[in-house]
Amino acid sequence: MGAWYSTYYEVGVNWASPKYDTAADYPNWATDRYKDYGYADMLDFMLLGAYASTDEIYGSGEWNMQGFCTNAKKLLMGDVKFAGGPDIGNSTGWTEGGQGDKIPQTIDACINVADGYFVFDMVHIKMYDYWNDFKKGFDDYLNSIQ
């Protein structure tokens, strides 16, 4: 699921909690009943694409990885646990590889707000040899919670 909730309604998807009052935050497009169609409470777990460019990892706004995850936590209202993560092969700055130093930052930005981390797409880890970068990111995270 794409974490860009402010525009995801355009494809007819309301992944938020039905307890979340969408119309209060998005009165330009959400009706008072839009919240009734949220389905987060029907899921066991959710993967949310926090797809942003290499220079949009940290921040509080919706359009960066950390912000996507922070917003998702608010929208899901505890109804379902979720993992957020980047697209490391198609988003701006990621398409040519060579961004290994950014991988630990993506893990930090997403996993510390969400309930987990995922990456799209595994093929890019192999293609750009990001294995050690992921290991460093997860090791850093595990060391931070001990």
Name what the model sees in each region.
Residues 34-146:
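Substrate-binding cleft of secreted/luminal carbohydrate-active enzymes
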Residues 1-31, 78-91:
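Aromatic-lined carbohydrate-recognition surfaces of secreted/lumenal glycan-active proteins
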